[in-house]
């Protein structure tokens, strides 16, 4: 995995600074990405496995090679990682395991990627040592095959409940699957993400559009009505008495862009 540096705008612009901030910590089979945690953040990421590693890398250059890439990483060609500790540059998480299997034998390794937030007063377990209690609890929840299988079943049950409110039986299997599964799934993704991560919006610029968000509700409202209601109230809060509205707003802060729209389809 390759870790972001927590600031999408800065990640894509201030390269000289970004190459100086990356910070990681390795504890057994867990790689903690803690860039700027000491200075200003209350969150970190962790990439872990439930088995002892043979070697690891946390530097992208060390894993891929200075002129290499993910298609043919230097560590894969060499047959081992170099136990690199990233100080700046591009922090990553890579595990290497050496396994010997008898004929017909099976072994499993569980990998997890998690995000942890700590209250400001609980950031450190000792001076300069990040508080790993929540990360350790997360790893303990998914430490065995049985626990992971149970979590996957719970996830499947969650989606089954969401999708079961609208099902098509047409006699055409592919049409049924498109309408009953993928159309609903895409409607939920669109509701959550709006136009982010597209050619139109990278995720940090325009926010959520007034008109688009109203339209997105139509395909989602039957799935989680309470969230649809919350979105309607958020959208309504950007509208004025004369019927005009802020053209877009940011979903995390609920703040609006600094201009109103005169577009007819925003009224």
Language-model features: locations:
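Beta-strand-rich interaction surfaces with strong enrichment in secreted/lumenal proteins
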Residues: 84, 96-100
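Short beta-strand and strand-turn-strand segments in soluble, beta-rich domains
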Residues: 86-94
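Short Pro-Gly-centered flexible turn/kink motifs
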Residues: 99-117
């Amino acid at each position: 995995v390759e870790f972001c540096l927590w600031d999408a705008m800065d990640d894509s612009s201030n390269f000289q600074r970004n190459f100086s901030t990356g910070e990681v910590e390795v504890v057994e089979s867990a790689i903690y990405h803690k860039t700027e945690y000491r200075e200003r953040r209350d969150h970190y990421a962790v990439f872990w496995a439930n088995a002892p590693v043979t070697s690891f890398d946390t530097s992208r250059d060390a894993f891929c090679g200075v002129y290499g890439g993910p298609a043919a990483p230097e560590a894969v060609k060499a047959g081992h990682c170099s136990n690199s500790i990233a100080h700046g540059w591009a922090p990553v998480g890579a595990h290497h395991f050496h396994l010997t299997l008898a004929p017909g034998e099976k072994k499993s390794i569980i990998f997890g990627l998690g995000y942890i937030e700590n209250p400001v007063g609980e950031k450190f377990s000792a001076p300069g040592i990040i508080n790993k209690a929540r990360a350790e609890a997360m790893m303990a929840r998914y430490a065995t095959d049985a626990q992971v299988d149970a979590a996957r079943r719970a996830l499947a049950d969650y989606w089954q409940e969401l999708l079961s409110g609208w099902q098509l039986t047409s006699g055409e299997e592919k049409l049924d699957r498109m309408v009953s599964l993928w159309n609903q799934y895409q409607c939920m993704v669109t509701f959550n993400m709006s136009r982010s991560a597209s050619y139109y919006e990278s995720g940090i610029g325009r926010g959520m559009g007034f008109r688009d968000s109203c339209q997105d509700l139509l395909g989602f409202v039957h799935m989680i009505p309470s969230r649809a209601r919350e979105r309607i109230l958020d959208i309504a809060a950007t509208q004025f008495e004369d019927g005009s509205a802020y053209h877009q707003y940011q979903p995390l802060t609920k703040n609006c862009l600094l201009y109103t729209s005169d577009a007819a389809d925003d009224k």
